[in-house]
Amino acid sequence: MIEKKNESIKEIIEDLVKKLTKWEHEYYVLSNPSVSDEVYDNTYRTLLGYERKYPQYVLSYSPTQRVGSSISNKFIKVKHDYLMLSLGNCFNFEELLNFNENIAKISKQEDNPYVLEPKIDGLSISLIYLDGVLSEALTRGDGVFGESVIANIKTIKTIPLKINTTIKKIVIRGEVYVSNQDFEAINASRDEDKKFANSRNYASGSLRNIDVSEVAKRKLNAFFYYIPNAYELGFETQYQVIQQLKEWGFNVAKEIKLFSNIKELYTSLKELENNKNKLDYRIDGAVIKYNNFKDYEIIGYTSKFPKWAIAYKFAPTQVQTQLKDIILNVGRTGKLTFVAQLAPIELEGSIITYATLHNLEYINDLDIRINDYVYLIKAAEIIPKVIGVNLDKRPNNAKKLEFDYNCPSCHQPLVKKPEEVDWYCIYDQCKQKQLQYLIYYCSKPIMNIEGLSESTLALFFNTKVNDVIRECNELITNQNVSEDLSLFKLLDNEEQTFVNSVLDIYQLERYKEIIIKPWLKKGFSKSSLKYNFRFQEKSFDKLINSINESKNRELYRLLAALNIKYIGIATAKSIANTYHDIDQLKNLTVEDYMRLADISSITANSLFSFFSDEKNWELIEQLKTLSINTKDEINNDLVDSSSIYYDKKFVITGSFSISRNDIIKKLSLKYKIKFVSGVSKNVDFVLAGNSPTAKKINQAKVLNIPIIQEEIWNK
């Protein structure tokens, strides 16, 4: 009898969940409710009553499970099942036609079907459903790893907690955003100095709020548009995916359309651009996807984005404001940058007060003067940029920039190569250059030292150790201490700051006592101190742990961190994929560097110059003494030395189903293959993907070099 009663209660709960889920979809997604708010609220309360009485029957996808007031997020990093790649850009019809021509080479037809989608200006999200139940939600992160925000995602009522599918595991991607109407209402209710800069930042910040109950109040929404492995799951076209997402109850942008050719699509695309301000959500362009999945693998990918889709960037909105001043800054490489300080102006949903002026030549060519009224756009919808001057409004007090060709920080003479437009400070002791380099070194993409923000680094960089010691000793002398304490000994070097170089970062722990001052008398206010670093013992220990963790970063990060001209993360990865120990770079020639994949002669010369300088090797040796990792460990158990590919030289050309960097890394580790950039008699194999360079293929044939056209990295 009890079993029957329990079965009946279970069925009642399931029926209530089914009803409420249907009504939520009608109200939040379709904007067409079939029941009144009163009916919904009463049913919700009824379900809540049953769930409290019979918690063993609570369903994970019940509407009551969207918000748990006691939940807090930890934002654990999780690897994506499929890379979250960015998209290539185009800006006009001609570039769109070029995109179509590349597709046509594969499809063998002039007219190709495309899906046009609005490019939502929000935060990318990847949902994972297991047996139809929402189980995980990840942000884009770096495209390889994202942060889990599942608790916060569940608060968005347009996202179904359960979908009707027999697929065991499915990944569904979309964009979290806030409507224009809701964003304006939210900002209207806030004080002037607490208003959100733009809707995208608001959505991003909300989704990363640790308080789930607070997120539930944020009025977030989401659109969905993509299943990364749709073809494997039996879908044949992108438009079929869109229709299925609608059927499953996902919010899908009404503006998504299917076209039989690129010219038809372009007409509708321009209509979308002209009407973008009439939408109740912000878009920064449109996405064009080739509709037929069967050709995707053949069309392939670059190292950064798929070649079967492209983002069309709309012409930027132009506004006018007054240029109040021109600020000169020195970057980590010594490059001088020119920044316009502006009268605040709203542009594309953001309040703009600064914009780039590129370089001195740009300023002179446009005759930009302080106090001028200038035209402003967002370059690629992100970076504010001054594009011209309203000469009709030029005021009498407009004045040209006084440029004395000296560094604004150290006042040493600037230099410029005849073939370049940028001016550089080459003085090694330039304070601003040193600080910018330290900020770069500690940044997330490089050595990823959490706790050393720009402001904290600036404080450590500018504060003399002896000044802090004197303040501490004064506190001890005045008996503002909780224990008997000897005076701290002054350093011999009066000019020594806490962090003057990257080496000092790894020795910060020795200053713990004078930084956090745990010996201060209880109740003493640190706010009265002249030198207050705002660290408690726990936060300082966390910083030291992060510094120690940075010692074990991958080799490519260290290579990028060495501040070598023209060397960014992509080039550093290319080097580390071939040479797994920094010491191997000591005796390389320019030609050796040029043989590496994707490295130009300019970059090769820069690398050769850096690693030929004994001063730089002194720094590397000092880093080694501090236990900084300078090599990638190779697991010899995974190396296949019996393969015909072992220890051979390869040239890679064309596009592949995964990025070229990933291929190079896998093959370098598995077979110790060395990748070079050009085909010569010294090359053993050419690995060719889709649309390989004809010249390289022809050279390989002439030299009888075997051409591989299979995925040997998966063997």
UniProtKB/Swiss-Prot annotation:
It catalyses: NAD(+) + (deoxyribonucleotide)n-3'-hydroxyl + 5'-phospho-(deoxyribonucleotide)m = (deoxyribonucleotide)n+m + AMP + beta-nicotinamide D-nucleotide. It comes from Mycoplasmoides gallisepticum (strain R(low / passage 15 / clone 2)) (Mycoplasma gallisepticum). NAD(+) binds at residues 37-41, 86-87, 117, 140, 175, 289, 313. Belongs to the NAD-dependent DNA ligase family. LigA subfamily. The active site is at 119 (n6-amp-lysine intermediate). GO terms for molecular function: DNA ligase (NAD+) activity; metal ion binding. This is DNA ligase. Keywords: DNA damage, DNA repair, DNA replication, Ligase, Magnesium, Manganese, Metal-binding, NAD, Zinc. PROSITE patterns: DNA_LIGASE_N2. The keyword Ribosomal protein does not apply. Residues 640-715 form the BRCT domain. It is an enzyme of class 6 (ligase). DNA ligase that catalyzes the formation of phosphodiester linkages between 5'-phosphoryl and 3'-hydroxyl groups in double-stranded DNA using NAD as a coenzyme and as the energy source for the reaction. It is essential for DNA replication and repair of damaged DNA. Its EC number is 6.5.1.2.
